[in-house]
């Protein structure tokens, strides 16, 4: 919530939303240096779809980005029914009463040591020097069948995000950043079909 109110003069061309698969994958500074695109990475550790929706509402209250990138790992984040209801109520309360005794999204995670602190200089990007080359190069093998399910809650909030983007003249793009741990060909196929059914663009970088 704090970062989503930090908008550079002239506004934003693009924003990124998602979990830890996103905040070390897309650098707004690099986009600016190489393409002249102004952007901010609003991804946070363990971000849930409810957080994504209300954070995006907050972003649109302060800026009018042309493109919204949504990292797809959060589409598969597991929540039980109680968590889903609680998260939805928490995020609604945070949006209606920002800072009014309600947690400020990633801020409490940083304070508790559960998430890295990202500085404004990098526009939300977390500079991670611990990344190493993976040995599991066959993680996208088409013959390895795994289960992949998108819940009704995620489906419902995705529709709300699509509507929100349309209302604000922004294009929503689903993006899967490279991840040997969290991604596979089954998830690629399910996400591809999910995006096609919603009529939105999907980019898989795996």
Describe each region flagged by the PLM.
Residues 16-17, 21-99:
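Membrane-embedded segments
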């Amino acid at each position: 919530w704090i970062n989503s109110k930090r908008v550079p003069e002239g506004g934003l061309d693009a924003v990124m939303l998602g979990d830890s698969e996103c905040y070390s994958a897309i650098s707004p500074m690099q986009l600016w240096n190489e393409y002249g695109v102004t952007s901010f990475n609003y991804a946070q550790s363990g971000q849930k779809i409810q957080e994504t929706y209300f954070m995006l509402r907050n972003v649109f209250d302060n800026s009018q980005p042309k493109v919204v990138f949504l990292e797809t790992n959060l589409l598969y984040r597991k929540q039980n029914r109680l968590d889903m209801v609680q998260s939805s109520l928490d995020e609604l309360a945070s949006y209606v009463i920002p800072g009014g005794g309600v947690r400020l999204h990633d801020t409490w995670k940083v304070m508790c040591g559960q998430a890295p602190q990202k500085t404004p200089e990098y526009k939300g990007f977390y500079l991670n020097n611990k990344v190493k080359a993976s040995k599991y190069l066959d993680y996208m093998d088409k013959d390895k069948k795994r289960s992949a399910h998108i819940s009704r809650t995620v489906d419902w909030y995705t529709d709300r995000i699509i509507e929100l983007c349309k209302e604000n003249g922004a294009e929503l793009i689903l993006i899967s950043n490279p991840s040997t741990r969290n991604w596979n060909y089954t998830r690629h196929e399910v996400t591809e079909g999910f995006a096609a059914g919603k009529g939105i663009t999907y980019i898989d970088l795996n």
